[in-house]
Amino acid sequence: FLVTLSGFALMGLFAGSIHPGLRVLEILWIKQRDFIGMATAAGSGSLMPVAELHPDAWSFAQQAPHALYMTFFSPLTAYANGALGVMSAVENIAIIVLVSLLIRWRKPWAEVDKPLLYFCLSFCLLLALVIGWTTPVIGALVRYRVPLLPFLLLAFMCFADPKRIPWPQWARTNPLPK
């Protein structure tokens, strides 16, 4: 799986040598620059300070940890931006609580659906990087990350063992004998 994913990533990076319109890093660099300019001109209240990217792989690799932080954890700091900021912070807290509970009720590694897990995690990682690299505004970032949330929760649900979860009585498919 990792070999296939790496192969496609390399093809995407070197697609610009085949056709000049396919320079992925340059396109992402332009998107980030345009987004910062638009947010600054509009006076966005949730603009986060980000380091400006350059259209080379080293710049993107250096900013990858910050991009992941921006996508996954910066909505926690958005509570000061009004009711929508509070809702995005509560959403993040709910995800963290759910993930910690799913880890508590995990199943053995041999029983985990690994292809589904790898797909979900790679999709979330790639989308989170693109969002984090290009989006310095928390409000837009919260909207752009919506497609990755179901896959993130599905990835963590691959670890959950339904037999270990203490379901309430009304939610059980096979009620316990009385």
Question: What do the PLM-derived regions correspond to, one by one?
Answer:
Residues 85-86, 100-122:
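Membrane-interface helix-loop-helix junctions at transmembrane boundaries of multi-pass membrane enzymes
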Residues 125-140:
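Transmembrane-helix signature of polytopic, lipid-linked glycan biosynthesis machinery
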Residues 1-91:
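Alpha-helical transmembrane segments and terminal signal-anchor/GPI-anchor hydrophobic tails
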Residues 154-178:
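A juxtamembrane structural motif centered on a specific transmembrane helix
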Residues 66, 88-97, 101, 126:
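Alpha-helical transmembrane segments of multi-pass integral membrane proteins
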Residues 11-18, 100-110, 157-164:
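Structural signal for the C-terminal ends of transmembrane alpha-helices
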Residues 139-160:
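Hydrophobic/aromatic-rich transmembrane helices and adjacent perimembrane loops
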